[in-house]
Amino acid sequence: MDFNPDVSELNAFRGTFQFASVDEPFELLNGQKLDDGILAYETYGELNENRDNAILVFHALSGSQHAAGYRESVSRSVDPLWTDECKKGWWDGFIGKNKVIDTSRHFLICANYVGGCYGSTGPTSNKANSEDKYMSSFPWVSMEDLVRSQMKLIDSLQIKELHAVVGASLGGLLALTTMLLFPQRTRSLVSIASGLKIQPLQVIHNFEQVKAIENDI
């Protein structure tokens, strides 16, 4: 299996990029509300007639909805952040025809999280009815908020039950959270690199990530 296909091969396989609204206002677990909740997402493959072949893939903390293929740009507001690293799908080696997540059999959905910066409502988005960006005033979001917002997307696609939820790192924890919150809507779970306990070194790395985000905004 080629884990480093060239751009011409990636262009032959690309997802469908779309935006979806979550409930307005979308109420967060802490009681705060988002009046303009938008999710940027990509889909791969075809949803079957029974609408029961869908797989929801959660990306890692700094990932995007672009899980596979090649996408040169997203939108005018996102493109300044859409570096060369973003253009190539982060799981190309696993997603596609006859690959681990076989898009000839399954319909794959991957959405950028609320709080992300690749098209979904996040710190770099404008506040509702304003030219001002949220930046550090963006509400705190929990893993439950991220899962519930994505299940709103699943509802909008009229999918009652997911064939599987899949994710690695933060994405793996969100896959676990989905199974806990919506067990009746999830048949299978694949959670990678998301153990219940972590070593002190990982705590340090997480702290570094938090500080990098705080210093950036």
Spans of model-derived segments:
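Ligand-binding pocket scaffold of soluble enzyme catalytic domains
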Residues: 1-217
